[in-house]
Amino acid sequence: SKLRRDNPGLISCTITGYGDTGDAAQKKAYDFLVQAEAGICAVTGTPDAPARVGVSLSDLATGLTVFSAILRALLQRGKTGQGVDLKISMFDVMADWMNMPLLAHRYMGGAPDRMGLKHSFIAPYGAFRCANGALILISVQNNREFTALCEQVLQQPQLPTDPRFSENTARYANRIALEAIVNAVFEGFSSAEMVQKLHPPKHPRCILTECLIIS
């Protein structure tokens, strides 16, 4: 308070694990613990087991949130001359990142299932193994992308008019049959050949990259 009196434009920021009041304020707030308690682990992993995100998500996200909040405070001070005391908890940051699962739980009958590299609402989506054992990921988001995939990659232009696959809701409901079709094609080509087939930018795809390649 003395610093504030001496400098009304002061901007301060306090980072906590679970806030600064109540019993939770005394809890340890390691990244893994915050991920788990905020629900991140419950929607991450495979149907068999939850998992933590493979990087320190809570730490990184909190840092980004603090950065954004301080920038906003600087803009506000530039207009008003007044500073602000910011209080940001790691748990609140992660709870905010749970926006989609929480909305699904409230309005769509339940939180999304853990799906590994697959998606709980979209198909075809996920990793498909090629003839040489390598995995290629595709992420088809709409009917236009699905039609392009069927015509140019799968060489089955009739699929988009098949009632089982004509819309995303139908594709997801029949995803086992659809994934079998996609798998049958991918298994007939090496990953290099499939990358070439998927080369046009209209095809949402990537390879599953290991740390060795990135480094």
Description of each model-found segment:
Residues 180, 206-215:
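Conserved PLP-binding catalytic core of the aspartate aminotransferase-like
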Residues 124-205:
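Aromatic-enriched alpha-helical interface/lid elements that frame and gate functional surfaces
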Residues 4-5, 187, 199, 215:
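Alpha-helix boundary recognition
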Residues 14, 42, 90, 161, ...:
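Structural signal for conserved beta-strand scaffold positions within catalytic alpha/beta enzyme cores
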Residues 2-140, 148:
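Active-site-adjacent "lid/gating" segments in soluble enzymes
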Residues 93, 144, 209-213:
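Alpha-helix/helix-capping structural signal
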Residues 96-100, 170-178, 215:
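Short, solvent-exposed polar/charged micro-motifs at secondary-structure junctions
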